[in-house]
Structure formats: structure tokens, C-alpha cells
Amino acid sequence: MNHDNPKPDGNAELIVFDFDHTLYDGDSGSDFFYWLLQRNFWRKGLALLVTPLVAPLVAYLPTRRRALNVYIWIATLGLAKNEGLDHLIKTYVQQHQTDIQQRLLAPALAVFEQHRREGEQVVVATGAPPQLARAILELAQQSAFPVLGSILLPSWGALRLSRHCHHEEKMRMLRECGYADIAIAYSDSHADLPLLKAARKPVVVNPKAAREALFRQVLPEGTPLLNWGCKKRGGVRI
């Protein structure tokens, strides 16, 4: 399952949450794939070998997906089906349950749950695999809502990133699923500016301190910049 997207409720306000550094203190996808790379010495060694060439490319949007695919291919070599990925995600979450639960941001989850109680259509849109975000949120007893995430497909005996739910592609994926009229969007990242700009009310949470000026410049005056518990991030603490 790459995402779970029931038809939008036309009578409900649409609320979109990013996941990493918004609901969760960390980069869940990177942590998961790092764990996969550490499973045996040859994966770790091969990843270290390519890192000087590949790692700098991750920082740039035009080359980010291709660079990530190198690591994903190494991490999943021998795993040619998403069913195998689902099993590894379940194992990863079980083995790291205590740490993961500590990373879930209580103020964020309170806002998330409030929107759901009020009958609004809540969607999570993340650059991580959707199965991973869903498994993590289930630890907080949050389920039965749409999760859109990056799509992995079989490739040469491993998996590759077919669609990265990131930047403009995140908005394309939301629109394809019928989630276009966004009332409120929550995100930490300047890469989500297309999402934040599309929302009638953008809310920036846990931004990097160096990005706060950019958000104030390009988003509507009065846009909240909040901190929901990421100690190393900026925003007004609540």
C-alpha cells in the first residue's frame, strides 16, 4: 500500500499535516533507511563508499530524488516487493518503539486530534513511505485517516523511489487524490512552501531558525511560526 486516500469529504474543511519535524521530532524515513543499511556490513560499506559523491546531491532539489535512490537501492537490495518492506517497517517500529514514542510531539498530536474531533478532513502528506508514518502514528492511537507518502517500486532486485512526496510533487499527489482546497496546512520545511502557499491558512511549526525570515517574507503577514517541541528548532514555544 503506497497511500490510503478515501474520497475527500466535500462538506469538511481539509487540514494537511506534514509528518517529519511536524508531528514527529526527526526524519523518520532517513532513520528507517539508515537502519536498513546497518543490517549487514556490505550494505554499510557500499553506502560509505558512495557517500562522498552522493551525499552532497541530497541537499539540492533537482538531484535529491536520484541521490536518495542510490541509498534506497542499497538498503533494499534483495527486497523486490512492498510486502517485504511492510514487514521491515513493522520490525523497525517494534524494535525502536520507546524512542519513536518519545519523538512523537504531544502538542502536535493534540492539534491533530482536535481537528479530527471537530469533523475536519485530516490528511498526512509526507516524504517518508506512508506505511512508516502510519505505523508510527498508530503508536499514538491515531489511525483511520489518509496518508500520502513517497512511492517505492521494484527495480533491479531492490526498490526505488518512483515518486517523492516532496516540494511540488507533494501538491501534485494531493491534487490527484482530490485534496486541493486546503483550509490549513502545517509544516516545518521551506520545501513545503508550495503546500503552505496553497492553504488558506498556513502554519509553520518547528522551523529551522535560519529559515524563519524566509517564511515571514514569502507567507502572508501574521502566519504563525510555532514550536511544538523540537528543541533544536525555532518558532514560538507553546
Question: Residues of each region from the PLM?
Answer:
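Active-site neighborhood of HAD-like aspartate-dependent phosphohydrolases
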Residues: N2-R64
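Short, surface-exposed acidic
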Residues: R43-L48, N82-E83, A144, P224-L226
